[in-house]
Structures are given as C-alpha cells and as structure tokens.
Amino acid sequence: VGNKVYKIDVSTGKLEKSFGTKGFIESFTLVAPLIYKKKLIIVSPDSISTFDVENGKFLSEKVLNHPEKNFLRGAIWGGIALDRKNGIVFANTGNPQPGNYGVHRPGINHYSCSVLAYDLNSEKILWSFQDVAHDLWDFDIASPPILHDLEIEDKVFEVVISLTKTGNTLILDRNTGKPIFDIEYKRAPSSDLIGDFAYPFQIFLNTPERFSKIEFGHEDYNKLSKAKIHEIKEYLKNAKFGWFETHEFLLSII
C-alpha cells in the first residue's frame, strides 16, 4: 500500500506488529511479493530485494544497474514468477526512458525490454534475454513470465515463457536463458534523426509463429468503405510504414 508492505495475520486480520516497523516495511512495488523459504521477495521498479519473512529485517538488494546503463526506467512492473525448485525469480522489464528518443542513451540499454533470471541463493542475476534492443517504440514486456515444463521429442525442458508486444513468444531455458528454438537476427532500419541511434539488428522468431505483427500497411484496412479508406489514406499519406521503422522529424510512424 503506497510505499509500504504490510504483514497481516490472516486469522485475525490484524497487523503482525513484530514485522518491520509495527507491522510494515518501507518498500515500493508494482507487483505482488513472493515468499521463498524464509525470504520475502519484493521487486521494485529498479531492484530485487529480500527481507526476513518473520521480522521484516532487510537481507539483500540487487539493483539493475549495468555499467552500460545510461537511461531511466526499464522497470519491473509486468509481473514475476518463482521457480521454487531452483530458487530463481524471473522478471519481465519495461522500456528505457525517454521512450521514443534515444540520443542520450546509446547502446542496447541492457536489462530493458528483457526477461531476467535472478538466483535467490547466490543473489546474482543468472542471465538476461532482450526482446527489443534500444527500444524506441514502447515495446516493454507487459505480461508476467510463465513457467512450464516443455516436452519435445521425449525430452523435457524447464522453460520460462514471455509474451511480448512485438508478437514474440519467447521460450527460454530457465537455467541458461538460451532460446529453445532458433532465433533469427534481422537488420532493422536506421534512424533519420540527427544524433539518434537505432540498433541495427532486432530478433525475428519463426517458431513459435508470431501471434501479432508490428508492421502495418494499407492492406490492413481494405475492408472498409471507399470513403473511409480514402480518409485514412489521406491521414497516413506522409507516414512511414515498416518493421521497427524509426522516427523522422514531422512524420508519423505506423
């Protein structure tokens, strides 16, 4: 609630006054906390913290701050999942800020638009996998990760699955972060804005088939009335269309 996490006795509905400061600890989170062994796991937008589940004592914090990091956000807000057997927390992260202008945040913007695996025992990030490098399109991963045991040709893979705004279904090995299926890297358009940078390659999945597309064309509204089609074409006559199309001064991108 607000910037506090409370501990409530479910049998009485009252605060556990022995926890933290009279029943609460100061911590802000956008997702529900988890419990692993005797650790309370709280994920804030930019860190993963653990507390003693009995008394609320602070135990550890991992700030998602890579040496390359030169941007705001990349927040954990879409949800987390806990692999109790292996003691790993999986989290999906948001997009870097400023969102549509990347001049002051060159590089891939590590840990943004990514799936992260955090080892609760070693208190280290095991791996990360990025869906969109140097995001300029608000392609944060807005869904929680899903844990699943996937059987392929009589072999079982422990996987984490993330559905992304780009239409990708990322299926990754929980322990290594490696994709279960081959991933293609395709060349993406460069930026026309002076000083801006668009990452030259983005991932493209063939398996599983994308469940939606980010490309848009005139054929996508060809079942409307002639008058409406003409109206839309006029509105979009100066717009740019394409896969990971970049921004241009005074032009819209679709």
Residue ranges and their predicted role:
Residues 2, 7-12, 47-56, 108-123, ...:
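Beta-propeller blade signature
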Residues 14-27, 57-66, 124-133, 179-254:
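Aromatic (tryptophan-biased) beta-strands that constitute blades/sheets of beta-rich domains
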Residues 144-193:
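Phosphate/diphosphate-binding loops
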Residues 65-73:
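Active-site glycine- and acidic-residue-rich loops that bind
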Residues 1-5, 28-48, 72-104, 109, ...:
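Repeat-blade elements of multi-bladed beta-propeller folds
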Residues 19, 56-59, 80, 115, ...:
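Conserved structural-core and active-site-/substrate-pathway-adjacent residues in large, well-folded domains
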